[in-house]
Amino acid sequence: MQLRTPLALLGAAVLVLVGPPLLSTGGGTETGTQIPGLRFMVPNTPGGGYDITARTAAKNAEDAGLTHNIEVFNLPGAGGTVGLSRLVSEHGNGRLAMSMGLGVVGAVRSNDAPKTLADTTPIARLTEEQDVVVVAKDSPYKTIDELVGAWKEDPGKLPVGGGSAPGGPDHLAPMLMAQAAGIAPKDVNYIPFDGGGELLASILGDKVAFGVSGVGEYLDQIKAGELRLLAVTGPKRVAGLDAPTLQEAGYDVNFTNWRGIVAPPGLTEAERDKLTRLIEELHDSPEWRQSMKQNGWDDAFLTGDAFGDFLDAQDRRVVSVLKELGL
């Protein structure tokens, strides 16, 4: 990860379905990377980072011939913890996986959720990406300095929206911005949304003064001129986008987000290894490499126990950072 401050050390896509149990009985012989009946859950609404990641991964895996007919579904609620609870309840289901990231880590803490990521089977961390600071195209703020100047005058009157619960990336990034600008984080009027899709409607509808979310979520809207990009939160500019890093603009912020995949608890070693092998083959495919480039994602691949250790460390960092910010 590229985070240089405690906040920056924290970086978060899954499908939603309400109805019958998620257990699937896909037919066919399972060979190689084929997992008949595989389902990807997205724990927030359509259009967010988890959703884009899951649907991109499913399409790329199918296009590469790694497996077929992956179902992607959304189960939003409580920052991803509703989906997490459902995943944990599917004990031993080797045909289910959930797209997730730092947002779920934070939501577990902010919602005091009974189920945590320690109750899942870690599969892989896939990507890392910068957050973007955006406003609607008709916003009065043309630069990051203009926005921060108005924000400092009265933080409570300038609501900032994010697609994650407190403790998630879209919450921590503006808190880091506030701290760097001399604004007390506790004075920030942060409005959480259940994913970038919901947040986008509020930015375009002027329900929030500005929004913070992953670059891949709003790339199309930025290029189409629907959103004005003021800055990016990571260590370098994003190729193809005309916006400074926060550090270039004079704010000591270096923050990146991440996303990965977890599975239910209770998988056999063979089931876990098969799902991991599928994701490894996906990661190595030209289809996935092209999708990472198109979405502005950086490779952050990590599997198995190493990913499990990373999740534990992220949880500790979320607790530490929220305490540091007085939140």
Where are the model-predicted features located?
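Paired acidic/hydrophobic, glycine-rich loop segments that form the ligand-binding mouth/hinge
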Residues: 93-100, 160, 209-213, 228-231, ...
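Hydrophobic membrane-insertion alpha-helices, especially the h-region
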Residues: 8-21
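An extracytoplasmic/periplasmic, membrane-proximal ligand-sensing/linker region
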Residues: 9-10, 245, 270-327
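Short helices/loops that flank or line small-molecule/ion binding pockets
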Residues: 81-93, 151-153, 176, 180, ...
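Hinge/capping helix and adjacent helix->loop/strand transition within the periplasmic-binding protein
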Residues: 35, 60-64, 86-95, 108-194, ...
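C-terminal lobe and pocket-closing loops
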Residues: 217-284, 313-316
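Beta->alpha turn/N-cap motifs
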Residues: 98-104, 195-196, 212-218, 232-235, ...
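N-terminal (or domain-start) structured segment
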Residues: 5, 20-119, 183-197, 201-209, ...
